[in-house]
Structures are given as C-alpha cells and as structure tokens.
C-alpha cells in the first residue's frame, strides 16, 4: 500500500471537542489514545512522515497560525510548515474504524490534486502544487463562510472515489459522548 512518491500523513487534532465535553484526541481506543491510533494507521498505510495539526507539544503538533479557523486553518498551518511535502493524506482524529486498505484507495496513482471518498470531506489526499497552495491562500483570506474543507475541495474539483457499503462503515466519527459510547460498545477491545 505504498505510493510511488513519499507522502506525509496528517492527523487533524486541533478542535475544541466542545460537543464531546473532553479532548477527543485523548479518548482511549483499544489501549491507546485516538490520536496515537490515527498516527499508527497512517504509518501502517505507508506514510513516510506523520504530523499532527493542533497545539499538542507532547505529539510535536503544529499549532494553528490563525486559531479558531477550523480544519482548513489547521491544514493551512501544516502546509506552511511542511514545505518539502508533495502529497498529504489528511485524516480526522475521531475516525478510528478507518483502515490502511481504505486509505490506499486515496493513494492510487492519479493526476488529481485532490482525492476524497464520495459524500465525505475526510479522509482526503492532496497533491501539493502551486495551484493547491494558491487555492488554500485565497480561501484563508476570504470570508469566514468560505473557510472550509468543502470549499477547498470544490475549488480543486476534488475527485471522488466510490466505496462499498462495508467501506462506508469505516467513516464513523464521534462528536458526542453518546456516539463515543455506541462506538465503544459496538467495537470492544
């Protein structure tokens, strides 16, 4: 499941977790924090480097240059600090059912600058070139309503990969204690 070119994995872990009531990145998943689970997943999928978006010194996290701008702001900060990166695979911290095999579908050889799964913003693959960086800069300078992963994917004409029903089940994420409890109950250690 390796890409011909090296790639960098990015875990988006800078959110406030306000609906969860506690830091989602540190919730225990099969014996380790969710953040570590997602880092391990990216390494398993073949990432040469894995970086964390968010003010997390204990994980060498990259703090947002402009706080409170959501996932797009975190991604912009990572890209600004990863000048040598040519390809990023971006995952949220709260999607522990993702598999390396599914991420591999994003990494299939492609000429697309942006690749994501149908009906999903994340995970996504970005092949960084001047046009991707410019699109990100324009969105970050624009109105707050345009600062979203959806807007970035739209501006890059993101290619959508189809998934099976069983693969779709891997996109479960958790934003509330009830969702987390259900996920733990359905996926015991």
Swiss-Prot record:
Signal peptide: none annotated. Pfam families: NTP_transf_3 (PF12804). Its cofactor is Mg(2+). Keywords: Cytoplasm, GTP-binding, Magnesium, Metal-binding, Molybdenum cofactor biosynthesis, Nucleotide-binding, Transferase. GTP binds at residues 12-14, 24, 68, 94. It catalyses: Mo-molybdopterin + GTP + H(+) = Mo-molybdopterin guanine dinucleotide + diphosphate. It is found in: Cytoplasm. Transmembrane segments: none annotated. Mg(2+) binds at residue 94. Its main location: cytoplasm. GO terms for cellular component: cytoplasm. Its EC number is 2.7.7.77. GO terms for biological process: bis(molybdopterin guanine dinucleotide)molybdenum biosynthetic process. One of its GO terms (molecular function) is molybdenum cofactor guanylyltransferase activity. The N-terminal domain determines nucleotide recognition and specific binding, while the C-terminal domain determines the specific binding to the target protein. Belongs to the MobA family. Transfers a GMP moiety from GTP to Mo-molybdopterin (Mo-MPT) cofactor (Moco or molybdenum cofactor) to form Mo-molybdopterin guanine dinucleotide (Mo-MGD) cofactor. Monomer. HAMAP family: MobA. This is Molybdenum cofactor guanylyltransferase. It comes from Xanthomonas euvesicatoria pv. vesicatoria (strain 85-10).
